[in-house]
Amino acid sequence: MNFETTIGLEVHIELKTNSKMYSPSPVNYGAEPNTNTNVIDWGYPGTLPTLNKGAYTLGMMVATALHADIARDTHFDRKNYFYPDNPKAYQITQYEQPLGKDGYIEVEIDGHKKQIGIAELHVEEDAGKNTHGSDGYSYVDLNRQGTALIEIVSKPDMSTPEEAYAYLETLRQIVQFTGASDVKMEEGSMRVDTNISVRPIGAKKYGVKSELKNLNSFNHVRLGLAYEIKRQSQLLIAGETIRPETRRFDEKSGETYLMRVKSGADDYRYFPEPDLPPMHIGDDWLKEVQDNMPEMPAKRRTRYVDELGLPEYDAGVLTNTKEMSDFFEAAVANGAAPKQVSNWLMGEVNAYLNDKQIDLQETALTPEHLAQMINLIKDGIISSKIAKKVFQEIIQNDTDPKAWVEAKGMVQLSDPAKLTPIITGILDDNQQSIDDFKNGKDRAVGFLVGKIMKETRGQANPKVVNDLLMAELNKR
């Protein structure tokens, strides 16, 4: 029996704001517990929320980037539930009329493009965080309570774990390029829940879906979905019934485990939020958002290929993060050849970042210094070998590359007037190598070049050395 899979994703993204969605409490990741919170977040009687317009504007930017229809008239709703990390016993969200509807993302998998629909996206506030201590007590940190979120709900348009992975990666890039969020799963600013069901091919009715939680990376999403496809398919083959469940993914075993069985639809008793007025998005506000939309990663990739002559692979790597893409553009603007900048960023820079497990912004490297170093190579002032030493200096210490090279005596020797006497001297001492060259033994040239480089302590320009050496050999 063959099956088809249906996958939908719900993604919560923390918006990059200085204060919370409905209160003036600051937002600082990693702050001491319960230091970024106030009576509005706690739901004290008599306190009133105030909408963070900046957060809503960021939500509109994300909606625009996802090609969604933005609701011009909307309101906020209360989602009622009790949990220790939610002292108000309700969440302010958008239920009846979300910020945006009917958007889409275009993903590419193995060279094939596919459009995945966005059912809706809405702004809301986050809950706090529960921690269960080894001392038998549970602790609540309300720093996160009230933080501005946008929830993006996909349509059930995905059918493989690879499509889900590509969707999340593309969504991460798009949101990051808008500047609305850092979208770092390790810091909780991007969280993913999946819904997945399996049914026999050709069946009109969707299968019973399971929800997956505890997905801490895109790879965990892919692995968890792959396991669920296998698990649900085996149940159907065995003639067993699939229950509507919430399951968690265990990264050690690569399997999913039951958290709870869903007995029915959750009843959150939504009703319009009485403490916030209805929202109207005027023409001026919408136009301001549209006029200030930054270039999206797909457009940058196209421009890098069409205008800068980069291979598609390079363009894809460079636009994986806005940080790397902006750095590339700044280095090119400082006069370095695009392909050379790309080579250094994808090679030495990425290797350094991976080795140190840090981001580019945590290094001392600047676009100006990288461009200057690349041009030192182009102008023959330093060799590629010396450039690697220069690179280690400028990425760690914010050093001017040209000044450092000159101070260290690393300027490449390219003057024929200085190189010729060295070359002739080495030839005079190595008649056997001259004879080998004349007898067609090409390795003799390599031997002589090595002697010259040793004599100049590696500072001789290899191209100039080769040209002068060949000219001198042909004279003898």
Swiss-Prot record:
The enzyme's E.C. designation: 6.3.5.-
Protein name per its UniProtKB record: Aspartyl/glutamyl-tRNA(Asn/Gln) amidotransferase subunit B
One MF term in the entry's GO annotations: asparaginyl-tRNA synthase (glutamine-hydrolyzing) activity
Reported function: Allows the formation of correctly charged Asn-tRNA(Asn) or Gln-tRNA(Gln) through the transamidation of misacylated Asp-tRNA(Asn) or Glu-tRNA(Gln) in organisms which lack either or both of asparaginyl-tRNA or glutaminyl-tRNA synthetases. The reaction takes place in the presence of glutamine and ATP through an activated phospho-Asp-tRNA(Asn) or phospho-Glu-tRNA(Gln).
Keyword line: ATP-binding, Ligase, Nucleotide-binding, Protein biosynthesis
UniProt keyword annotation of ATP-binding present: yes
Enzyme type, top EC level: ligase
GO biological process: glutaminyl-tRNAGln biosynthesis via transamidation; translation
